[in-house]
From Swiss-Prot:
It comes from Pseudomonas syringae pv. tomato (strain ATCC BAA-871 / DC3000). The gene is queF. This is NADPH-dependent 7-cyano-7-deazaguanine reductase. GO terms for molecular function: preQ1 synthase activity. Homodimer. It catalyses: 7-aminomethyl-7-carbaguanine + 2 NADP(+) = 7-cyano-7-deazaguanine + 2 NADPH + 3 H(+). Catalyzes the NADPH-dependent reduction of 7-cyano-7-deazaguanine (preQ0) to 7-aminomethyl-7-deazaguanine (preQ1). Its EC number is 1.7.1.13. Keywords: Cytoplasm, NADP, Oxidoreductase, Queuosine biosynthesis. InterPro entries: GTP-CH-I_C/QueF, NADPH_dep_7-cyano-7-deazaG_red, QueF, QueF_N, QueF_type2. Pathway: tRNA modification; tRNA-queuosine biosynthesis. The active site is at C184, D191.
Length: 276
């Protein structure tokens, strides 16, 4: 467990405060988890963003009438801190009985508070339900590898030694799996996700990739660090010209988390998947 997470509200009984309380936000420094992967803020081998989508955003108009909306938050992958997820939820709930004179004021408030917690500018987009309905459900790019026949015997920790490639071939492809699962390092609750790998490099053996993804099944770590670990393991193996790893996790408490790490300019489709 990250030492800072021990002091967060995650896994503890919490009072739900319904009036604006920005002090509820609990930042967790990324540095300790980067260090586990041999990284520092100055040596990150990727660009990236963590997309958080909130489906339970509500506030009051000055008249007292409630408003509901969906919010998208984009937290830079090189921000000094992540925001602990339960504290994020408690903070958003604190808007429920607070009056704002419009969505623009809500957006500005969210940007100010979340940027202060993350230590870097956080993008905020507030959307109405009709926009989301019109977008529909996204389909991940590339080939789904979930029907491949594999034998699995260990689930306790990621096993990069399972990964195989043919370095006599250089190819460009996208593959994805819906079998990503890990556990919250604080509560041990399951985190269910889908993951996309897009790259140009040595030809990756798809069955070995699937076995590797499944090896995360009982691993305890935050969403962001799971994706960073996958990125680094594939980068070491493939030595790719370009590489993107993008995971979309099932929501919990009205929030889903979607980390994106890439060697390329960010080009992210943040539409929800069928399980989101």
């Amino acid at each position: 467990m990250h030492p800072a997470a021990e002091h967060s509200p995650l896994g503890k009984s919490s009072e739900y405060i319904a009036t604006y309380t920005p002090s509820l936000l609990f930042p967790i420094p990324r540095a300790a988890k980067w260090a586990e992967l041999g990284l520092t803020a100055q040596t990150l081998p990727y660009k990236g963003v963590d997309f958080w989508n909130c489906y339970e955003l509500s506030w009051l108009l000055p008249s007292g009438k409630p408003v509901v909306a969906i919010a998208e938050f984009s937290i830079p992958a090189d921000s000094p801190n992540i925001i602990e997820s339960k504290s994020f939820k408690l903070y958003l709930n604190s808007l429920n009985q607070t009056a704002f004179d419009g969505a623009a004021r809500v957006q500005a408030t969210l940007e100010k508070d979340l940027s202060a917690a993350a230590g870097k500018l956080v993008g905020v987009r507030i959307r109405n339900l009709a926009e989301i309905e019109e977008e529909g459900v996204a389909v991940l790019p590339g080939v789904c590898i979930d029907e491949l026949d594999i034998t699995v015997s260990s689930y306790d920790q990621p096993q990069p030694e399972l990964l195989r490639c043919d370095d006599s071939q250089v190819i460009e492809e996208a593959v994805h799996s819906h079998l990503l699962k890990s556990n919250c390092p604080v509560t041990s609750q399951p985190d269910w996700g889908s993951v996309v790998v897009e790259y140009r490099g040595a030809a990756l053996d798809h069955a070995s990739l699937l076995a590797y993804i499944v090896s995360f099944r009982q691993h305890s770590d935050f969403h962001e660090q799971c994706v960073e670990r996958i990125f680094l393991d594939l980068q070491r193996l493939l030595k790719p010209e370009k590489l993107t790893v993008y995971a979309r996790y099932v929501r919990r408490g009205g929030l889903d988390i979607n980390p994106y790490r890439s060697t390329e300019v960010l080009d992210v489709d943040n539409r929800r998947l069928a399980r989101q």
